[in-house]
């Protein structure tokens, strides 16, 4: 049966920022079928560079998939923008599932 993804977005950790890097992570959990796409936007502009997607194998218990998408930035790049958004497109929804956060509210 088709299953819609549960989508979460996570800002970089303070520990990572202290080292000069910044990874924003979008998690999509327990979806089916496997075909899914993620689009990253920074302040409303699509960002393709530095994105790494990783799909986990089918879950033996409920036959769903999970995926993480990591947007890797420098700390300076991260701190020069405010709104971070991942948009997830899956057949279970006619419109994208959108998750975002404002950096200055973290």
UniProtKB/Swiss-Prot annotation:
Disulfide bonds join 26-86. Residues 5-102 form the Ig-like domain. Keywords: Disulfide bond, Immunoglobulin domain. Pfam families: C1-set (PF07654). SUPFAM superfamilies: Immunoglobulin (SSF48726). One of its GO terms (cellular component) is alpha-beta T cell receptor complex. PANTHER family: TAPASIN. This is Ig kappa chain C region, B allele. It comes from Rattus norvegicus (Rat).
């Amino acid at each position: 049966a088709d299953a819609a993804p549960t989508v979460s977005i996570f800002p970089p950790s303070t520990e990572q920022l202290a080292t000069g890097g910044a990874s924003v992570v979008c998690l999509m959990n327990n979806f089916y079928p496997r075909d899914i796409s993620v689009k990253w936007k920074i302040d409303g502009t699509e960002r393709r560079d530095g994105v790494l997607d990783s799909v986990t194998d089918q879950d033996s218990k409920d036959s769903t998939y999970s995926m993480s998408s990591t947007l890797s930035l420098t700390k300076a790049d991260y701190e020069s923008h405010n709104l971070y958004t991942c948009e997830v497109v899956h057949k279970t929804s006619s419109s994208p599932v959108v998750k975002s956060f404002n950096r200055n509210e973290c």
